[in-house]
Amino acid sequence: MTVIDGKALGVKLQAALAEKTARLKEEKGLVPGLVVILVGENPASQVYVRNKERSALAAGFKSEVVRVPDTISESDLLDLIERYNQDDEWHGILVQLPLPAHISEEKVLLAIDPDKDVDGLHPTNMGKFWSGHPVMIPSTPAGIMEMFKEYQIELEGKSALVIGRSNIVGKPMAQLLLDADATVTIAHSRTKNLPDLARQADIVVVAIGRGHFVTKEFVKLGAVVIDVGMNRDENGKLIGDVKYDEVSEVASYITPVPGGVGPMTITMLMEQTYEACVRSAK
């Protein structure tokens, strides 16, 4: 069994990104700029935002975190986003989710300039993605594809099961696997006989948001298991959707939590911010 080390791969890719950024600054005078807007004081969101800021600075980017109270009105938040849309120094805009109940997530995602939507969640970018002309790709699935590439995991002709159907992970993950010529099935919380279905898959990507949901009864010997889940157990420990100790006994490759998919998500956000900066100069 091989552990897919997303943290180490992220460090490797971000070192290469820092070199590209330095060359971009030297040759064209461009510095990628990433702004992250954090609404409220959700502890998990604060951790994610700190990690994004740290990665942006390490890559040589201009970075800013805008913290606003969770009492901010929807219109004021939309106005704030528009200010960064109009500022050419910023090439990537992220609004950390989740948002307070009085703010429409849909309106916020629509407000971000598609050219600066490095999360790839604006309908314009989604449309380009689904039509086979991607510009911004949702970062978690993009990071998983980089893992497959780094570890030389063959996808063509393989049977892949994606457990989870979100617009952020499940659906785009299935599309990227299809594009790589895998045969893909999407399952979810209402899928019947899920363990039986999962045992037929060569590759299982789990993004269902339930701690330790997938046990070794779901996984055939030698399968590749990618765990996107980030949950807390009763003691506050970070755990994935996969029961790692069990499943690692039968999987050929597996991602840990933490240190698997999470660091790669942030790495791909940085890559897409760099690419947005390059496109802005054309």
UniProtKB/Swiss-Prot annotation:
Provide the catalytic activity annotation. (6R)-5,10-methylene-5,6,7,8-tetrahydrofolate + NADP(+) = (6R)-5,10-methenyltetrahydrofolate + NADPH; (6R)-5,10-methenyltetrahydrofolate + H2O = (6R)-10-formyltetrahydrofolate + H(+)
Q: Which residues bind NADP(+)?
A: G164, R165, S166, S189
GO biological process terms, semicolon-separated: L-histidine biosynthetic process; methionine biosynthetic process; purine nucleotide biosynthetic process; tetrahydrofolate interconversion
**What Pfam families does the record point to?**
THF_DHG_CYH, THF_DHG_CYH_C
Name the source's superkingdom. Bacteria
**Has UniProt tagged this entry with the keyword Transferase?**
no
Q: What are the record's GO terms for cellular component? A: cytosol
Record's SUPFAM superfamilies?
Answer: Aminoacid dehydrogenase-like, N-terminal domain, NAD(P)-binding Rossmann-fold domains
The record's section on Gene3D superfamilies has: Leucine Dehydrogenase, chain A, domain 1 (3.40.50.10860), NAD(P)-binding Rossmann-like Domain (3.40.50.720)
Give the pathway listed in the UniProt entry for this protein.
One-carbon metabolism; tetrahydrofolate interconversion
Q: Which residues are the signal sequence here?
A: none
Q: MF terms per GO, please?
A: methenyltetrahydrofolate cyclohydrolase activity; methylenetetrahydrofolate dehydrogenase (NADP+) activity
Stored InterPro entries: Aminoacid_DH-like_N_sf, NAD(P)-bd_dom_sf, THF_DH/CycHdrlase, THF_DH/CycHdrlase_cat_dom, THF_DH/CycHdrlase_CS, THF_DH/CycHdrlase_NAD-bd_dom
Q: What is its EC number?
A: 1.5.1.5, 3.5.4.9
Keywords annotated in UniProt: Amino-acid biosynthesis, Histidine biosynthesis, Hydrolase, Methionine biosynthesis, Multifunctional enzyme, NADP, One-carbon metabolism, Oxidoreductase, Purine biosynthesis
Function, as annotated, reads: Catalyzes the oxidation of 5,10-methylenetetrahydrofolate to 5,10-methenyltetrahydrofolate and then the hydrolysis of 5,10-methenyltetrahydrofolate to 10-formyltetrahydrofolate.
> Whom does it interact with, and what assembly results?
Homodimer.
Q: Which family does it belong to?
A: Belongs to the tetrahydrofolate dehydrogenase/cyclohydrolase family.
Q: What is this protein called?
A: Bifunctional protein FolD
